[in-house]
Amino acid sequence: MRPVVSTGKAWCCTVLSAFGVVILSVIAHLFNTNHESFVGSINDPEDGPAYVIFSYLFRRYPFTISYISPPY
């Protein structure tokens, strides 16, 4: 069975994925600590840790959360 992509391209994807995990972890940490650059403006969320948890759940379970309707 032949590989789908070459070894070099597979390593490139692995490195890019690891870099993305690091960047997203830093952003999540800044929201979680209520850093001023992320939650200090008028239009930014007031509760940083709650925003991080909701973002994680939406990323992890997108179809489950998308079916929850707001109360009217």
Curated annotation (Swiss-Prot):
The chain crosses the membrane at residues 11-31. Keywords: Membrane, Transmembrane, Transmembrane helix. One of its GO terms (cellular component) is membrane. The keyword Transmembrane applies. InterPro entries: Ribonucl_Kappa (IPR056552). It is found in: Membrane. It is a single-pass membrane protein. Completely overlaps YPR170W-B. This is Putative uncharacterized protein YPR169W-A. It comes from Saccharomyces cerevisiae (strain ATCC 204508 / S288c).
